Amino acid sequence: DGGQSWKTISPDLTRGLPETIKSSGGPITQDNTGAEFYSNLFAINESPIEKGVIWVGSDDGLIHVTTDNGETWKNVTPPPTLSPKLNMINCIDPSPFKKGTVYVAATSYKFGDYKPYLYKTNDYGKTWSLITKGIPQNYYSRAIRSDKVREGLLYAGTEWGMFISFDDGNSWKPFQLNLPITSIRDLHVRDNDLIAATHGRSFW
């Protein structure tokens, strides 16, 4: 109804760790930025080809999926061998071509880990693969999007620029062109255009 009324469709889909949601700073003066708090849902996206399939990622490292429009949820977080515990799930992009396929961009730079974390699953999160070949290991990832026309064409935004993949993430190449060297915070594919949102250097 256009946002006139709302209903809850999930339980808490975060880790809810007490040590990450307490007040920071002090002991006399507390921080008031809010940036240090965790246990937030940070990314959500629905499948463009499957009704009722919704993916959710939290800023404390969890990924959940529902296949029945929120009636039930399944924790499909990548294993610790692939994803740090408190990996911030920045971006979730379900495939417009394959059911059960989703691409994820995550980051763990707040813990001194500057590696890119881009993931792909083809089976609703039962198994995951890390897809970062060709991206420098200090270019931590911010966003990943799939092309809506050409299957296997992916775009990735990192802290230091753009990358492109023509083989469904198996390999990446720089796609900087005339973009400024800055953080690519999000990407949007619209018709025949790719839109990039940067940190402090405008839209492109």
Regions found by a protein language model. Name each.
Residues 1-204:
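Beta-propeller blade termini and top-face loops
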